[in-house]
UniProtKB/Swiss-Prot annotation:
The keyword Disulfide bond applies. SUPFAM superfamilies: Cyclotides. This is Cycloviolacin-O24. Disulfide bonds join 5-19, 9-21, 14-27. There is a cross-link at residues 1-30 (Cyclopeptide (Gly-Asn)).
Amino acid sequence: GLPTCGETCFGGTCNTPGCTCDPWPVCTHN
């Protein structure tokens, strides 16, 4: 879930590889 990927995901998806939209709306490395 952390650290953050420097990307937001209001649409529910992250473009950064290896990152998930959790906690919404912040992309974090899973």
